[in-house]
UniProtKB/Swiss-Prot annotation:
Protein name (record): Gamma-glutamyl phosphate reductase
A UniProt-annotated Pfam family: Aldedh
CDD domains referenced in this protein's UniProt entry, alphabetically: ALDH_F18-19_ProA-GPR (cd07079)
NCBIfam families given in the database record: PRK00197.1 (NF001221), proA (TIGR00407)
GO biological process, one term: L-proline biosynthetic process
Record key words, sorted: Amino-acid biosynthesis, Cytoplasm, NADP, Oxidoreductase, Proline biosynthesis
Its EC number(s): 1.2.1.41
Pathway stated in the Swiss-Prot or TrEMBL entry: Amino-acid biosynthesis; L-proline biosynthesis; L-glutamate 5-semialdehyde from L-glutamate: step 2/2
Function: Catalyzes the NADPH-dependent reduction of L-glutamate 5-phosphate into L-glutamate 5-semialdehyde and phosphate. The product spontaneously undergoes cyclization to form 1-pyrroline-5-carboxylate.
Domain of life: Bacteria
SUPFAM superfamilies xrefs: ALDH-like
One cellular component (GO) term of this entry: cytoplasm
């Protein structure tokens, strides 16, 4: 398997990917039986290796960054690609935090006894082999590899060409951790070629050797995965995130939340993209909120009321209401109370993350109950839509579907279950 991770050309893509799949399946069987101590040892060794190689990772990332910059890619893309010393340390710390999490494998989720004396247990087990397809985020290599390992799953990582140098070094650190703990290197495999045909092979399921696909990237990548995958997918297509300012909102609190939700990092999927303001508080809240955004360097595209609130506002088009900007841009609209906010979110949202700012508990309860998103918030920045912030030790992605996993996908969501039935000679009449 080591040779596969060094190959740049040679065997055709289908043959290469089939071998990666077979080796990952073998490794998954080993991982499913690995002890908590063994998995944690591998994770801690990987974290230590990343710290040791931090300088080399930063240098490789600088090359990736310069190459992407020369191509003229968007600022939000560059932000996701960048690994400075603090982000590299955060990556190592994140792996160690995953090691400190409770082992999700082997948990008894339910236990009951039947009238005939059978004792039935529902027990958490690994999913198997997880394929992760990602673009500009080299840190996904560490996050995804660590989370899959903790949950007893093998991982097949296919990063984008833009982060190839960074991802290769991070992957080397993960493999070093595996080998130090006596686990197979194929437990965390990296697709060593940039050929897009490799993605197609992964989406086919590699002859049954991939159990789940997780895409991390732009809309076109996620759409392709969702349309073409022949195995289950954990994903979200877009993060059209709303903040609704209710008539009972505290203006100072709303301002603080809004600025953080929009501008802390504009390129993350939890960044706010649309501000909805209750018409009942527009006279006191709309202009100050819009001014604060504009003064902070955020472009505002708004409806007629927002245009009147500040001459720097540009008119919003219909497309703006469903736009995921991933930039310092926000759309602003007045709505008729909580009914209007919920209706707007239902019409234009992406079921990712939405927030209400209010001091009215009844309004908050209704919003949290009726907005059909994976994450709904009350009086908190939407940038908390993150597995690490949820205490999951990071995330492999955020899922907005309804099957199996929804919201941040952490170690618990990377397991399924089986039933263990204990008897004492019972036969069925």
């Amino acid at each position: 398997m080591d040779n596969l991770n060094r190959v740049a050309s040679g065997p055709d893509v289908r043959t290469l990917m089939a071998e990666i799949g077979r080796e990952a399946r073998k490794a998954a069987r080993t991982l499913s039986l690995a002890s908590t101590e063994t998995k944690n040892s591998a994770l801690l060794a990987a974290a230590a290796a990343i710290r040791t190689k931090a300088g080399a990772i930063a240098a490789a990332n600088a090359q990736d960054y310069a190459a992407a910059q020369a191509k003229g890619v968007a600022g939000s893309f560059l932000d996701r690609l960048k690994l400075d010393p603090s982000r590299i340390e955060a990556m190592a710390r994140g792996i160690a935090e995953v090691a400190a999490l409770p082992d999700p494998v082997g948990r008894v989720l339910a236990r009951f006894e039947r009238p005939n004396g059978l004792v039935i247990e529902r027990v958490a087990v690994p999913l198997g082999v997880i394929g992760i397809i990602y673009e500009s985020r080299p840190a996904v290599t560490a996050d995804a590899g660590a989370l899959c390992l903790k949950a007893g799953n093998a991982a097949i990582l296919r990063g984008g060409s833009e982060s190839l140098r960074s991802a290769a070094l991070i992957h080397d650190c993960l493999v070093a951790g595996l080998l130090e703990a006596g686990l197979p290197a194929a437990a965390i495999s990296r697709v060593p070629i940039a050929d897009r045909a490799a993605v197609g092979e992964m989406l086919s399921g590699l002859n049954g050797d991939i159990d789940v696909i997780v895409p991390r990237g732009g809309k076109s990548l996620v759409a392709r995965v969702q349309n073409e995958a022949r195995v289950p997918v954990f994903a979200h297509l877009e993060g059209v995130v709303h903040i609704y300012i209710d008539r009972a909102a505290d203006l100072a609190k709303a301002t603080k939340i809004l600025l953080n939700a929009k501008l802390r990092r504009t390129g993350v999927c939890g960044a706010a993209e649309t501000l909805l303001v209750d018409r009942a508080c527009a006279a006191t809240h709309l202009a100050p909120l819009v001014k604060t955004l504009l003064d902070a360097g955020c472009a505002v595209r708004g409806d007629a009321a927002a245009l009147e609130a500040d001459p720097r506002v540009s008119p919003a088009s219909e497309a703006d209401w469903s736009a995921e900007y991933l930039d310092a841009i926000i759309s602003v609209r007045l709505v008729d109370g909580i009914d209007g906010a919920i209706a707007h979110i239902e019409a234009y949202g992406s079921h990712h993350t939405d927030c209400i700012v209010t001091e009215d508990p009844a309004a908050a309860d209704r919003f949290l109950a009726e907005v059909d998103s994976a994450i709904v918030m009350h009086n908190a920045s939407t940038q908390f839509a993150d597995g690490g912030e949820f205490g999951f030790g990071g995330e492999i992605g955020i899922a907005t579907g309804r099957m199996h996993a929804r919201g941040p996908v952490g170690v618990e969501q990377l397991t399924t279950f089986k039933y263990r039935v204990h008897g004492d000679g019972q036969i069925r009449p």
